[in-house]
Structure formats: C-alpha cells, structure tokens
Amino acid sequence: MKSLTSWFVLIVSIAVIVSSCAKSDESTSSSTSSSDDTSDNSTTTSDNSTNTSDNSSSQSVPGVFVALAESGNIVRSTDNGSSWDNVTSPTANDLNGVTFGNNTFVGVGASGNIIRSTNNGSSWDNATSPTGNVIRGVTFGNNIFVGVGASGNIIRSTNNGSSWDNATSPTATNLYGVGFGNNTFIATGDQGNIVKSTDNGSSWDNATSPTGNNLKAVTFGNNTFVGVGASGNIIRSTNNGSSWDNATSPTGNNIRGVTFGNNIFVGVAASGNIFRSTDNGSSFDNVTSGLPGTSDYNILGVGFGNNTFNAVGKGGN
C-alpha cells in the first residue's frame, strides 16, 4: 500500500458481492463504525462489515476496494488491496462511511455530505442530503441505502442514492454504525444505544442493550449481528437484534471496526489489536501476536472481499 497522509479508516470491497448473491444472509453490515479520537470514521464492506447488504442485483468487480478519509480523500485499489491510487473527490469534507449496492458506492461524512459513484469508484458526484448533521455510517439492503449520524439522525434513499429523506428516529443520541441482515437494519451508538428497523428503514424502535459503552460498529454474518465499541466491548444477537448478549473480548482497548467473511468475524482496535471469532461471535481470540509492527498502528477499520481482509488506520497505514 502506498504511504498516505490521511487517516484512511473506511474500506469497501465489491468483489464479495459474488458470494452475497449466493448467500444473502452473509452479506455485510459500515460500514460503519466510528473511531474514538478525532475522527468519526469507520469501516464497512459490501458483504460483511459495519453495514450489510443483500445485493442480489449487484454486479461485482473482483479485487476492487475503496477507502475514504478526512478532507474528502478517496483512494481505490483494483488489485485486492496490494496497491492504491488517489481518486478525485467532489468534497473537502471529512468522509466517515462507505458502502456498496446496486452497482453504486455511497460515501457519507461531515455536514451531511453524501457522495456516490456508479463506475466502481473511478469518479464521484455529490448527492442531495436532507441533513446538515454529520453522517457517520451507511449501509445497503433490500435496494435501500440507510445512513446514520449525529443526534440520532437516520436518512434513507430508495433511488440508488440519488436523493435522500429523513426517517423518524427513536433516539437523540449519536449513532455511529449501521448494518443489514435478514431484512433488518441495526444501528448502534453512544451509551450502548441500539435501534432497529424491519420495514426497510421507514420506522425504527429501540432495542435493549447489554452495555452502556459507546458502540462504534456493527456487522452481520451467519444469522448473527455483532457490535463492537469502547473498552473492548463486543455484543451479539442471534434473533435479528431483538435481544443482545455480551461476548468474550480479548482486549480492553476501544474497538473501531468489525467485519465478516469466510465464516469468521474479525475486529480491529487501538494499539494494533486484531482479533477474530470462529464460533459465530461467541468468543474472540487475539491474532496480533507475531505480526510485525502492529502495535505501532492505530487500526480504525477492516473490510473483507475476494477472500481478502484489509485493515486500515491512522497515517495511511
């Protein structure tokens, strides 16, 4: 990966859409999570991260990844994350989340900014936004894009991200991550707040949370939602977000991103922590041991596609 000066903390792969066409229950939940320091950015992939998507109508381009960051920075890889190039951005605002669906990338950020690309991330345009609040997470499911952000703001698009409307939110707390699976949208935020929608994002209800810690990201796989956040907190739900339990965590560090692929949940945290679960999110083990220099990286996001996990963090790492 080329050295990049910004905090590239968002990553999406559209290569994995091939598998999500065949296995819609393993499609992704956000894109999106938020970092715990100066940036609201998070990670999402088109089939399994902070946002999840049942992209049955989407076409994939193997090996294409897109990462967004502060100051409107956009980078793109066409070789499975081995090398990256800058892409012209239509905004100078910080970008916090990105997802893919219906052959369209959608990115969200500060001041309600929404951008979209319909040519695999090669070029981007601004979309009309219904809010001036910061948008922190975005996902795709059932042909609907849903974004979440400050003060409980929830927005949705039914026309491939061209225009957006506000949805009624049951909370005024900040929301960071949003995911989709089994015809259910789940969003997570401050003070352990969890909200869910079963009608394509039109209406939302609060769900009971097992934690009071901030929840920064959520993903979906194997009929399981997994949320992560402050102080190493990991929660999971196996009944479409109706109830949640705490999972065993290998770290006390703030967890910034989580994704799902190849029947494995992978999370990333501060101080280079990388951990995974092979038992459907019940417990997680640290896999950082033996990896060179990982303690030097402030890892902020992780994504999966084309049988490849990519993690991104501070300083363009």
Predicted segments with their positions:
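Bacterial N-terminal signal peptides that target proteins for export
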Residues: 1-8
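Bacterial Sec-dependent N-terminal signal peptides
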Residues: 10, 15-62
